[in-house]
C-alpha cells in the first residue's frame, strides 16, 4: 500500500507489517508516483508537446476556420523520459466536432490528450460504424495544409457523416429503456455525457490502447457505481435494489493536496472549469441482443475492471466492497475471485468509521459536511436531454474530485490519530474478502425449510389455543399490554410471587412481561410457560425460517456483510443475519395433527438447513474462549494466566467454577458451570447487576453477591477495569490491542447512570474490540494463503464473531484444516504488529455436510 501512503504524503511505517500490508506499502514507493524530479521532466514534456500541437489543431472560433498542422494525429502522444506514454494537458476548446447549425460549420480536433479519441462529437450512432476510424483519418489528411479551404467543402464532409449516422440510428432504437426514454449515454445527439464523461463503448482500437496506458499512468483512480436510475454510490440513499448500469472512473493525473473549491449549496460547476483529469464511463449492462461487438466490449470492460482491482495506484471508492462485488458478479465466474485478494482500495467510509466508530452508516454528503465542512447535494438525473447530460456529467466529475479530496483528508486524520497502520493492515485488506463472501452463495435445503416452517406454524396455533384456555379468555398473545392485564390484573401472579422486587418497565414503571419475569412466574401458573415457548417458536419461525426463505434465491442465500456496523470493530450481517442463527437446537412438542415420526418432541436446529455444495464440506474454526483469554492477558491475573498457560485437559469454565466456589472439579454441575460462564461474560461485556440478575434468574442482590465474590477471587480483573476506566477519563477514549479507538464522551457526564454506562463500555470495548481485531486478522491471513495457493480452493462463507465457516473440497479438508489451525493459533505472537499475548490461543475445528451437524475434527489433522 505504498501508493496509498505516498498519495497522502506519509512515510512508510517503521514497524514491519504483515505480508498484505507490506504489499500495500511497497506499491507506494513504486515508479507510478512521480517524484519531484520526474514530475518536472514530465511537465516540460507536456509543455513542449502542447506548444507543438497548436500547429495541427483545428479551432472553430469567431466563424473562422483555422488551419491544420502537418503532423499526423497518431502523434498526439509523447514519450516521457521513462519511456511510458503520458497524457498531455487538454486545451479548453480543442475537441473533435462535426456539427452544422445556422449555416456555420465548426470543426475542431483535440490537439493532445485522451479526449481526441474518448470524446468525439460526431453523431454517436455513426461512430459505431466499422469504417468510422478510417473516415476520421481520411478527413484529417485531406485538410492538412489547406488553410484557405472554403467552408463548403467541410460542409460536404459533415453531410456524409450525418447520413451515415441516420442509418446507424435505426439500430440504436433497440437500446431504449422500457419507459420509452433513451438510456444515457446512448443518446442520439452526443457520444459523451457532456464534456467530462466519456463512454468507452465507442472507442477504436487505438483509443482503447491509449485508455489502458492512461490507466497505468494514473496517479490515482476514483471510481463509483452508476445505477439505472442515474444515481451513483455517492447518492444519499443506498441503492440496494437498483440495477448497476455502469461504472465511472476518474483518472487523477497528479496527487497531492488539492485546493478544489466547492460550489455553493446546490450550485453547478462553472463552464470554464478546466482540469487535466479524465473521467470515463464503463457500461456494464448487457444487451439482450447478441452482437460480436458486444462480446468484444465485454472482454475489454472485463480487462479494464480486473486491472483496476489489481493496479498499483490507489483506488478511491465510497463503499469499495460493493464495487468489488459488482465486478465479481459481472465477470468473476471463472475462479477469478483469487485475483481480487490484493485489492486494497481507499474507502472513506471505513476511514471515517475508524475515526468515529459511533457513526456507522454516514452518507457521502454527511462525510463531506463533517470533514470538509462543505454542503453538497448529490442528485440523480431522471432526464436525458443534452443540458441534463452535461449537468449530470459535470456533477459526477465534480463529486468524484470531492470524493478524492475527502479521502485524502481522512487519511491525514488517520495518521494523526495513530490509526493508519490499523487501516492498512486490517480494515482495507478485509474489503475484498467481504466482497468475495457476498458473491458466494450458501446452499439451503428448501424442502426441509418449508416443512419446518409448517411444523412451527402448527405448533404456534396449538400454543395459542392452550394459552387462551388456561387464561380463560382470548387475547392477543403478542400484545404485552393484554398479556400484562391477564397475568397481573386477572390472575394476580405478582401477588403470589415470593420475590420482593419484580422487573418493571423503564418509562411507565409497569410490571414487566419480559423473559426474566415469565421465568420467575412459570411455577405459579401454566400461562407464563406457554408464553415463553410461544415466543421461542415464533422467533425461530419468523426470523430463522421464514426470514431465510424471503432471502433465498435459486436454492441458496448470501448475507450482506457490514464492516462499519458496530462500535467494537465486529462485523455484522443482514439480509439475512446469519450471525443471529443460534447453534443451540430447541425441542418442541410435535403438533398432534402433524405427520412424521412418532416421537412426542421434535428437535429444531435452523443451522441444519445450511448444507454444503456437492463435493464440499463445511469446516468451522472457532477460537476457544478468546475473550476470556484476552481478559487474562490484559489483566495479568495470575490465576487466569495459570489456567490457560497450563495444559487445558479440563474444561475452562468448570475449572473456573471449582476455583471460584472452592469445590472439587468433579462436583461441578452443569448449572454451576453455566452460572460461572454468565458471571465471567458479564464482566467482559460490561453488563450491569440488573442484566446479570436477569440472565441468572436471580435477584439483583444475589447477582451482586456473585459478581463481588468472583472479582474478589480474581482481583487483577478489577484492577484492570479500574485502570481502563481511569485512562478513559483522562484521554476520552480507549484502545484495543491493535490500536482501534473508541471515543466515549459520556465518561465525564454529570449524570451518574450515563457515566457508569460509559465506564462499562470502556472495559467491554478493550476486550471485545481486541477479539474482533484477532478474528479479522485470521480472516485476512487465511484468505491470503488460499489466494496464493495453486491448489487450495476453500471459500470463507460466514463469520460468526469468534467462528469462521469455510466450504472446502472434500479432498482438501486435512490440508486446509492444518493450515487454518496453524494460522489462527500463531496469532498469539505477531511481530509485525508488536503483539505478544501471555496466553496461547486455542482453535476448535469441526466438519460436516450441514452447518448444524458438525463433528469435532480429530486432533491429528491439526499437526499434519
UniProtKB/Swiss-Prot annotation:
It comes from Mus musculus. Residues 169-188 are annotated as: Disordered. One of its GO terms (cellular component) is nucleus. It is found in: Nucleus. GO terms for biological process: DNA repair; DNA-templated DNA replication. Residues 169-179 have a biased composition (Basic and acidic residues). Belongs to the DNA polymerase type-A family. The keyword Nucleus applies. This is DNA polymerase nu. Its EC number is 2.7.7.7. SUPFAM superfamilies: DNA/RNA polymerases. One of its GO terms (molecular function) is DNA binding. Inhibited by ddTTP. DNA polymerase with very low fidelity that catalyzes considerable misincorporation by inserting dTTP opposite a G template, and dGTP opposite a T template. Is the least accurate of the DNA polymerase A family (i.e. POLG, POLN and POLQ). Can perform accurate translesion DNA synthesis (TLS) past a 5S-thymine glycol. Can perform efficient strand displacement past a nick or a gap and gives rise to an amount of product similar to that on non-damaged template. Has no exonuclease activity. Error-prone DNA polymerase that preferentially misincorporates dT regardless of template sequence. It catalyses: DNA(n) + a 2'-deoxyribonucleoside 5'-triphosphate = DNA(n+1) + diphosphate.
Amino acid at each position: 500500500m505504498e501508493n496509498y501512503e505516498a498519495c497522502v504524503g506519509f512515510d512508510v511505517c517503521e514497524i514491519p507489517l504483515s505480508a498484505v500490508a507490506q504489499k500495500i506499502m511497497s506499491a507506494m514507493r513504486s515508479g507510478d508516483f512521480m517524484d519531484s524530479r520526474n514530475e518536472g521532466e514530465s511537465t516540460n514534456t507536456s509543455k513542449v508537446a502542447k506548444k507543438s500541437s497548436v500547429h495541427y489543431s483545428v479551432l472553430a472560433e469567431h466563424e473562422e476556420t483555422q488551419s491544420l498542422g502537418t503532423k499526423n494525429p497518431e502523434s498526439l502522444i509523447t514519450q516521457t523520459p521513462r519511456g511510458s506514454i503520458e497524457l498531455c494537458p487538454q486545451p479548453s476548446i480543442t475537441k473533435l466536432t462535426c456539427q452544422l447549425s445556422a449555416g456555420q460549420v465548426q470543426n475542431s480536433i483535440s490537439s493532445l490528450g485522451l479526449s481526441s479519441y474518448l470524446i468525439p462529437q460526431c453523431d454517436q450512432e455513426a461512430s459505431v460504424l466499422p469504417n468510422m476510424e478510417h473516415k476520421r483519418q481520411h478527413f484529417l489528411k485531406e485538410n492538412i495544409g489547406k488553410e484557405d479551404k472554403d467552408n463548403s467543402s467541410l460542409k460536404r464532409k459533415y453531410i456524409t457523416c450525418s447520413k451515415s449516422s441516420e442509418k446507424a440510428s435505426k439500430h440504436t432504437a433497440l437500446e431504449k429503456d422500457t419507459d420509452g426514454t433513451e438510456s444515457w449515454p446512448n443518446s442520439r445527439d452526443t457520444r459523451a455525457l457532456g464534456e467530462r464523461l466519456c463512454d468507452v463503448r465507442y472507442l477504436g482500437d487505438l483509443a482503447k490502447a491509449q485508455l489502458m496506458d492512461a490507466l497505468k499512468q494514473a496517479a490515482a483512480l476514483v471510481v463509483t457505481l452508476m445505477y439505472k436510475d442515474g444515481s451513483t454510490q455517492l447518492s444519499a440513499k443506498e441503492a440496494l435494489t437498483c440495477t448497476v448500469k455502469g461504472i465511472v472512473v476518474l483518472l487523477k493525473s497528479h496527487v497531492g493536496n488539492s485546493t478544489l473549491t466547492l460550489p455553493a449549496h446546490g450550485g453547478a460547476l462553472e463552464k470554464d472549469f478546466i482540469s487535466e483529469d479524465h473521467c470515463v464511463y464503463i457500461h456494464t449492462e448487457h444487451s439482450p441482443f447478441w452482437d460480436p461487438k458486444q462480446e468484444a466490449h465485454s472482454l475489454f470492460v472485463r480487462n479494464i475492471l480486473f486491472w483496476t482491482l489489481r493496479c498499483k495506484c490507489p483506488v478511491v471508492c465510497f463503499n469499495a466492497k460493493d464495487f468489488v462485488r459488482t465486478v465479481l458478479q459481472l465477470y468473476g465466474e471463472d475462479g477469478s475471485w483469487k485475483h481480487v485478494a490484493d485489492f486494497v482500495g481507499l474507502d472513506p467510509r471505513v476511514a471515517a468509521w475508524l475515526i468515529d466508530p459511533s457513526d456507522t452508516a454516514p452518507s457521502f454528503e454527511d462525510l463531506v459536511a463533517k470533514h470538509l465542512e462543505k454542503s453538497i447535494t448529490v442528485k440523480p438525473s431522471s432526464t436525458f436531454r443534452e443540458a441534463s447530460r452535461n449537468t449530470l456529467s459535470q456533477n459526477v466529475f465534480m463529486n468524484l474530485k470531492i470524493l478524492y479530496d475527502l479521502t485524502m483528508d481522512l487519511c491525514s486524520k488517520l495518521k494523526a490519530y495513530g490509526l493508519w497502520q490499523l487501516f492498512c493492515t486490517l480494515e482495507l485488506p478485509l474489503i475484498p474478502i467481504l466482497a468475495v463472501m457476498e458473491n458466494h452463495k450458501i446452499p439451503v435445503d428448501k424442502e426441509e425449510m418449508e416443512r419446518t416452517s409448517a411444523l412451527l406454524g402448527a405448533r404456534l396455533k396449538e400454543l395459542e389455543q392452550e394459552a387462551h384456555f388456561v387464561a380463560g379468555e382470548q387475547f392477543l398473545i403478542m400484545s404485552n399490554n393484554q398479556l400484562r392485564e391477564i397475568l397481573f390484573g386477572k390472575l394476580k401472579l405478582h401477588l403470589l410471587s415470593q420475590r420482593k422486587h419484580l422487573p418493571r418497565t423503564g418509562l411507565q414503571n409497569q410490571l414487566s412481561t419480559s423473559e426474566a419475569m415469565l421465568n420467575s412466574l412459570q411455577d405459579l401458573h401454566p400461562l407464563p410457560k406457554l408464553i415463553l415457548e410461544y415466543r421461542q417458536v415464533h422467533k425461530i419461525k419468523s426470523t430463522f425460517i421464514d426470514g431465510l426463505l424471503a432471502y433465498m434465491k435459486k436454492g441458496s442465500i448470501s448475507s450482506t456483510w457490514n464492516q462499519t456496523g458496530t462500535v467494537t470493530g465486529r462485523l455484522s450481517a443482514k439480509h439475512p443475519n446469519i450471525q443471529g442463527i443460534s447453534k443451540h437446537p430447541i425441542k418442541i412438542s410435535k403438533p398432534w395433527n402433524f405427520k412424521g415420526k412418532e416421537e412426542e418432541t421434535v428437535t429444531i436446529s435452523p443451522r441444519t438447513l445450511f448444507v454444503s455444495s456437492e463435493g464440499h464440506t463445511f469446516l468451522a474454526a472457532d477460537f476457544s474462549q478468546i475473550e476470556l483469554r484476552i481478559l487474562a492477558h490484559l489483566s495479568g491475573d495470575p490465576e487466569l494466566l495459570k489456567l490457560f498457560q497450563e495444559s487445558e485437559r479440563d474444561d475452562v469454565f468448570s475449572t473456573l467454577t471449582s476455583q471460584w466456589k472452592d469445590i472439587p472439579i468433579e462436583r461441578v454441575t452443569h448449572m454451576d458451570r453455566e452460572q460461572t460462564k454468565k458471571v465471567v461474560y458479564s464482566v467482559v461485556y460490561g453488563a450491569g447487576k440488573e442484566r446479570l440478575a436477569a440472565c441468572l434468574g436471580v435477584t439483583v442482590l444475589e447477582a451482586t453477591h456473585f459478581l463481588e465474590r468472583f472479582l474478589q477471587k480474581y482481583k487483577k480483573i478489577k484492577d484492570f477495569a479500574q485502570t481502563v476506566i481511569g485512562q478513559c477519563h483522562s484521554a476520552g477514549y480507549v484502545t484495543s490491542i491493535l490500536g482501534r479507538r473508541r471515543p466515549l464522551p459520556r465518561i465525564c457526564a454529570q449524570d451518574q447512570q450515563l457515566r457508569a454506562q460509559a465506564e462499562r463500555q470502556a472495559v467491554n470495548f478493550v476486550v471485545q474490540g481486541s477479539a474482533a481485531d484477532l478474528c479479522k486478522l485470521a480472516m485476512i491471513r487465511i484468505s491470503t494463503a488460499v489466494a496464493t495457493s495453486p491448489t487450495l480452493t476453500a471459500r470463507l462463507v460466514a463469520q460468526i464473531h469468534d467462528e469462521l465457516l469455510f466450504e472446502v473440497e472434500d479432498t482438501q479438508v486435512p490440508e486446509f484444516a492444518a493450515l487454518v489451525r496453524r494460522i489462527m493459533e500463531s496469532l498469539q505472537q505477531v511481530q509485525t504488529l508488536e503483539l505478544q499475548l501471555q496466553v496461547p490461543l486455542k482453535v476448535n475445528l469441526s466438519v460436516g455436510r450441514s452447518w448444524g451437524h458438525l463433528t469435532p475434527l480429530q486432533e491429528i489433522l491439526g499437526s499434519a
